[in-house]
């Protein structure tokens, strides 16, 4: 009886059934039902095979796409990688690439670190063992090519592929070898990726060195028989840009390696390969020069298998800093052409045969525009001269040398005005430096032969304020924007600015995983990505809990970068916003601390670096800034606690320094010294301050006796700031309405304005007013919570009173109650505001071709919604077109203002803006252009742009009418794809200032 192998190509678009071996003996007869579910051309087909004859298997089914082929439990037919008898030897050929031999040496070390048993590594010599692991490159390794000629291995679907590997188990490949696991690469990196895939599957994280992730120890390791591949990458070039590297990375590299030399870069190259990246823009801040600082840098890069290039303003494989060493004079082609051409020729000559992608084009000196106006003809002429140099030096047509043109900042103006480059040059589009794509190719441009790329940012130095300290990137936004790019045909180069590499570990992993196979990570897979990543770093220890920490701390940081936070960013007066933000971080820190305390010692360093430290640092920062906000507000109110918060700010400011010291000195015996040295407190311009500067605080003189003050939550404000202080001549403040549907609980804050202890009492003058306490003694301040007993409250509108007494004074606070509301369902108005998250729609209408999906966790407060496919054509809003609906209740008729909270997506179509339609009930839909007024481009730091990237949100307003109190329906129609809806806030006359917008309203089922 023959074994049946099921073969799928890497795109899961074909099915081949082939006969592989005849069974050697019949063991027994049994029934097996095999159901295979595959995806072909986006259709699911179910194939069922019923076998009635049991067999002895000599090979198993091929498994595709990141399937685990490792087991720690032995089973019949499994290949032993390591057990108590030792680790299986490794074998490779000296004829293979140096990078492949180096990678298999890494595998040898990895197996030893995981199992404690070092496998023997043989080069060209067959080990004295019945089993062996072989690695080699098709067409390069004599060993592999010999096995192919003898038909001992099957390389179907491998020849001519880009970076593809196959890992397969075979019987009797070599005389004396009974079985082998063979890793075959279609090219150098294909083999290397296959080797590192095995390392990762046995429990070695790509971040084992860069984040001290522990090796996941195993006593026994077995490989499940079969043939495995991850196919070809979806994106050809996938890489990082080490940028903005001073002071942190530069000082660290100088201390640990003597600078950005090949010893430093060896760690970078290995990290890239273990993450299946292949492309690098190296560090380039003054005075760094990749090729000149250490002549071994490019040689080692090529040996490892890294494709080198240079940044958007460094053409022809030359660091811009070399121009100063070269003494080239003015960086101006019109006045200094000969010097520039000579300079560029030197870059191509030095490049030699090293695998590279040559940046072409020209920008101004120091990351600036080349000319004041858009000089299309000049730039086209420059590129033609550069391509002539490439052809002359290499001795082959320019199109045979990979090239890229970076459409960055002002260069996009050239593209927008019709400039195009030769068909063999990759066109690298860019985001706006803040993670928002600026332009994508139109369908008619997709025939550009070498395709398109994206240059993305996790780090940036520039307006409105640099962000460099910690990870502020949500992988959900990366997914949404890069999925947009991929579906618009951008598949040839994905590059991301990662700053100092640390602490961008999580988004780097995601960026590379997504670039390899975007189809494998859909929106609903994003929550599990955090879990998988946590497992990769920490095993099964609290993986789900760690995933939650990762998803939330990045969400909180993405609301506003730490460098841009101010004492008044979050409201101290409305919606308890500032308090909620601090409490959210404190809850994260508490959970993180609990996990840290439970982890094995071997895992604590990595957990501290990847999870705990950024949470602790950002928790401290947010608490400090809110404390500074309290100091200012409480000082204005004359509170004694103003001085307390001045001291609190100082305490937390110095704690920030201590946390930095701890990271530098205590962690791994100082391994990461300097890595957290980026200043992050006290920005007054776009550029970082020389040193962290504590937020300004003030101290007040308090009375020598006790003095009573008070403040009501959400207080109406005829009085100064909504509170009453003796001698101010203020009106008695009032709460906003209480109602039986929302059943609010608001606080009354009693505070002391003197040095002595204040005794106070609070008394409700109506029996339906409930107080959390009636009296107290305070040195500073205390909250008394007010609610209503609705069984006793009178019907209709009425106002009760609370009397506050203390220090010989009595004050009256009004308590308005509204107990005459209409029947309510949907999201319920609360004092003139209705708020709901976009993902919490009450109804959605999809069409055959277009549907709404939720992107979990994307956004500042909850999740977001988008339409798919993201490259759909524009729709006309009507009763049958895609829309979402939200039921809500308002208590009065009148004008409503709807605020749509949108991710700050740019008009990447460069047409007339991205549009949606909106209506309440049966209104005629209003067409809203989310990009209206965006005339001045972002690179000129337009006001519209600086605000939306600072806030990480764009709010679009529209006016509507509620013709009656009661239930209504908000309708949102898709017109253009690409718009990300985060939340909606309806102002029915009670909107109050806050950064995040009103929290979601209560929802009542119909």
Where are these regions (language model features)?
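Gly/Pro-rich turn-and-neighbor structural signature
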Residues: 215-222, 292, 302-303, 328-449, ...
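Extracytoplasmic
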Residues: 719-721, 727-736, 741-1006
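Structured mid-domain segments that build the active-site/substrate or prosthetic-cofactor binding neighborhood
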Residues: 273, 278-281, 288, 296, ...
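Feature activates predominantly on carbohydrate-active enzymes
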Residues: 149-334, 352, 404-408, 419-435, ...
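C-terminal non-catalytic alpha-helical accessory regions
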Residues: 66, 216-218, 530-684, 873-874, ...
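Contiguous, structured surface segment used for ligand recognition
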Residues: 60-231
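Bacterial Sec-dependent N-terminal signal peptides
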Residues: 1-65
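Catalytic cores of secreted or luminal carbohydrate-active enzymes
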Residues: 654, 658, 662-729, 834-854
């Amino acid at each position: 009886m023959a074994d049946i192998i099921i073969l799928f190509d890497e795109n899961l678009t074909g099915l081949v059934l082939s006969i592989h071996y005849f069974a050697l003996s019949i063991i027994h007869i049994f029934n097996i039902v095999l159901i295979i579910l595959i995806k072909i051309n986006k259709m699911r087909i179910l194939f069922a095979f019923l076998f009635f004859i049991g067999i002895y298997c000599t090979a198993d089914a091929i498994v595709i796409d990141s399937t685990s082929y490792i087991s720690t439990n032995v089973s019949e037919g499994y290949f032993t990688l390591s057990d108590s008898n030792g680790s299986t030897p490794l074998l490779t050929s000296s004829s293979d690439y140096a990078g492949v031999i180096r990678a298999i040496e890494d595998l040898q070390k990895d197996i030893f670190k995981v199992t404690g048993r070092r496998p023997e590594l043989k080069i060209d010599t067959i080990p004295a063992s019945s089993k062996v692991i072989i690695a080699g490159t098709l067409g390069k390794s004599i060993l592999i090519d010999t096995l192919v000629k003898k038909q001992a291995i099957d390389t179907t679907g491998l020849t001519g592929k880009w970076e593809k590997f196959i890992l397969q188990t075979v019987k009797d490949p070599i005389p004396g070898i009974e079985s082998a696991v063979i890793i075959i690469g279609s090219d150098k990196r294909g083999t290397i990726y296959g080797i590192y895939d095995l390392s990762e599957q046995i429990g070695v994280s790509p971040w084992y060195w860069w984040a001290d992730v522990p090796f996941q120890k195993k006593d026994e390791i077995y490989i499940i028989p079969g043939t495995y591949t991850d196919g070809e990458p979806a994106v050809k070039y996938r890489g990082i840009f080490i940028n903005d590297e001073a002071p942190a990375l530069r000082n660290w590299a100088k201390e640990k390696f003597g600078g950005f030399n090949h010893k430093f870069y060896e760690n970078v190259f290995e990290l890239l390969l273990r993450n299946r990246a292949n492309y690098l823009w190296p560090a380039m801040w003054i005075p760094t020069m990749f090729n000149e600082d250490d002549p071994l840098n490019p040689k080692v890069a090529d040996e490892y298998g890294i494709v080198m290039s240079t940044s958007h303003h460094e053409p022809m494989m030359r660091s811009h800093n070399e121009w100063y060493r070269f003494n080239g004079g003015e960086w101006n082609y019109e006045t200094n052409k000969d010097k520039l051409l000579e300079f560029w020729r030197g870059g191509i000559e030095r490049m030699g045969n090293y695998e590279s992608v040559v940046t072409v084009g020209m920008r101004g000196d120091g990351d600036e525009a080349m000319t004041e106006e858009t000089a299309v003809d000049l730039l086209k002429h420059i590129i033609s001269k550069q391509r002539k140099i490439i052809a002359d030096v290499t001795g082959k047509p320019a199109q045979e040398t990979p090239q890229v043109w970076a459409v960055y900042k002002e260069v996009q103006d050239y593209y927008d005005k019709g400039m195009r480059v030769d068909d063999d040059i990759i066109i690298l589009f860019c985001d706006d430096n803040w993670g928002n794509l600026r332009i994508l190719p139109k369908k008619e441009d997709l025939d550009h032969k070498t395709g398109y790329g994206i240059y993305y940012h996790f780090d940036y130095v520039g307006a409105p304020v640099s962000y460099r300290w910690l990870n502020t990137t949500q992988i959900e936004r990366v997914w949404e924007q890069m999925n947009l790019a991929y579906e618009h045909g951008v598949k040839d180069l994905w590059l991301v600015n990662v700053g100092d590499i640390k602490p961008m570990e999580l988004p780097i992993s995601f960026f590379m995983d997504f670039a390899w196979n975007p189809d494998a990570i859909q929106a609903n897979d994003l929550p599990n990505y955090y879990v998988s990543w946590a497992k990769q770093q920490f095993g099964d220890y609290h993986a789900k809990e760690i995933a939650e920490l990762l998803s939330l701390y990045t969400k909180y940081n993405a609301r506003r970068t730490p460098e841009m936070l101010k004492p008044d960013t979050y409201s101290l007066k409305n919606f308890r916003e500032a308090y909620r933000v601090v409490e959210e971080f404190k809850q994260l820190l508490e959970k993180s601390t609990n996990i840290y305390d439970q982890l094995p010692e071997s895992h604590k360093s990595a957990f501290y670096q990847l999870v705990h430290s950024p949470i602790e640092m950002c928790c401290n920062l947010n608490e400090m800034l809110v404390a500074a906000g309290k100091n200012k507000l409480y000082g204005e109110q004359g509170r004694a606690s103003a001085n307390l918060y001045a001291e609190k700010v100082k305490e937390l400011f110095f704690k920030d320094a201590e946390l930095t010291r701890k990271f530098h000195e205590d962690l791994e015996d100082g391994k990461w010294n300097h890595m957290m040295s980026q200043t992050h407190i006290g920005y007054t311009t776009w550029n970082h301050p020389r040193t962290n500067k504590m937020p300004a605080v003030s101290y007040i003189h308090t009375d020598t006796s006790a003095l009573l003050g008070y403040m009501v939550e959400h207080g109406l404000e005829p009085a100064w700031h909504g509170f009453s202080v003796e001698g101010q001549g203020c009106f008695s403040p009032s709460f906003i309405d209480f109602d039986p549907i929302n059943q609010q609980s608001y606080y009354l804050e009693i505070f002391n304005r003197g040095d002595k202890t204040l005794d106070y009492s609070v008394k409700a003058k109506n029996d339906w007013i409930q107080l959390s306490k009636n009296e107290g003694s305070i040195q500073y301040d205390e909250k008394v919570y007010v609610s209503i007993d609705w069984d006793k409250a009178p019907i209709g509108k009425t106002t009760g009173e609370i009397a506050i007494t203390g220090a010989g004074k009595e004050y009256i606070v009004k308590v308005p109650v509204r107990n005459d509301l209409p029947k309510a369902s949907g999201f319920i108005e609360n004092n003139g505001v209705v708020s709901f998250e976009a993902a919490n729609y009450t109804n959605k209408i999809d069409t055959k071709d277009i549907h709404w999906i939720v992107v979990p966790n994307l956004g500042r407060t909850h999740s977001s919604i988008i339409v798919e496919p993201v490259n759909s054509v524009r729709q006309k809003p009507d009763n049958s077109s895609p829309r979402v609906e939200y039921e809500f209740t308002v208590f009065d008729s009148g004008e409503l203002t709807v605020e749509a909270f949108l991710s700050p997506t740019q008009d990447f179509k460069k047409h007339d803006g991205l549009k949606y339609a909106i209506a309440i009930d049966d209104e005629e839909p209003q067409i809203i252009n989310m990009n209206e007024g965006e005339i001045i481009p972002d690179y000129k730091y337009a006001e519209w742009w600086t605000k939306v990237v600072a806030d990480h949100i764009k709010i679009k307003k529209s006016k509507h009418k509620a013709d009656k109190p009661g239930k209504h329906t908000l309708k949102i129609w898709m017109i253009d794809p690409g718009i990300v809806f985060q939340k909606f806030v309806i102002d029915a006359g009670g909107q109050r200032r806050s950064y995040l917008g009103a929290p979601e309203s209560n929802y009542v089922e119909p």
